[in-house]
């Protein structure tokens, strides 16, 4: 394959850099939003804020997928505490619900917006976990978010663990309290 047809150059580059792949096929795709890494102590609040922002931007609920790097059980607490309607199966898609599932179950599928939850420091260091994170990230077509509990993993942790991946560093990633911002490249 010599052209990326699923996602933007920015999403493809981030996905590839997670697994330290030196591929450059992503340069042939279209340009879009930069993926956003959100460091927070309140993952549920940020998740709701991102979903609300996506819906306000014109995405339908069916266009949003919440992918856990852990099992579906990891999502259950969040699903029970939110007023949004979620579905946890990929067998039947419901236009009025946001899909919440594990990245492993979502392999081979895609979504306009992917929100990756349950990210921990080990996910950037372990080869198998990086492959799982690549699967989650590469499912996004237009917008990609990583929600990271800053009590578990900091931006410096990720930068240190990702030294071998070209272009993947803390440069350009800014997180603020409940808001997502991405700096322009310097």
Regions found by a protein language model. Give the residues of each.
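The feature marks helicase ATPase cores and/or their adjacent C-terminal helical subdomains
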Residues: 1-186
């Amino acid at each position: 394959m010599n052209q990326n047809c699923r996602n933007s150059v920015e999403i493809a580059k981030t996905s590839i850099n997670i697994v330290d792949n030196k591929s450059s096929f992503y340069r042939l795709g279209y340009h879009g939003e930069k993926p956003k890494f959100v460091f927070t102590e309140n993952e549920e609040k940020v998740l709701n804020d991102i979903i609300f922002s996506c819906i306000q931007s014109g995405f339908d609920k069916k266009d949003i997928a919440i992918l856990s790097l852990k099992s579906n059980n990891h999502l259950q607490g969040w699903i029970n505490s939110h007023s949004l309607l979620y579905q946890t199966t990929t067998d039947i898609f419901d236009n009025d619900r946001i899909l919440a599932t594990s990245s492993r179950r979502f392999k081979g599928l895609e979504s306009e917006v992917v929100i990756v939850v349950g990210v921990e420091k080990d996910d950037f260091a372990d080869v198998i976990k990086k492959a799982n994170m690549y699967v989650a990230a590469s499912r996004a077509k237009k917008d990609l978010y990583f929600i990271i509990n800053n009590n578990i993993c900091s931006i410096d942790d990720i930068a240190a663990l990702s030294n071998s991946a070209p272009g993947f560093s803390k440069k350009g990633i800014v997180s603020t309290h409940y808001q997502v911002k991405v700096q322009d490249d310097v």
